[in-house]
Amino acid sequence: LKENGNKLTFISMNGKTNYIKMERKIEERKNKFSGNSKIIFVIDTDNVSSNSNDLKLFNEIENYIKQKKYHLIFLNPDIERIFIPEKKIKNKSDKKIYARHFIWNDKINLNKLKSKDYSKNNTSNICIILEKIKNIIILRNNF
């Protein structure tokens, strides 16, 4: 996605444990783009509340991202329920379909997308991070 000199590029990690392996791909993409780059990791936190290994991995990723000065969007358990609040989706393949083509409607509680708690169900910090990135771009373009 490219607009007004800003470009959004998606790189799949193929699993949370591959976060360090992505560094080379990130650098390759950054070098192909002449503008300033902001890196955003998107992490699914479905098991951090119930699995100590997943919580440890999430904390490692969070520390790595802070060290690199990247941004982190977390998607908490059942995040798709924000976009489709009428029903709970149980089938994993259906969840993926809804996540890729979510339904935006007036029933969405945007406050649930402004959470700072990575363990609270049906929430994310996506609005906080995207607003922060938008402000960085606006500031950069004004100079």
Residue positions per predicted region:
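C-terminal accessory helical subdomains adjacent to catalytic cores in phosphodiester-
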Residues: K2-S12, I20-F143
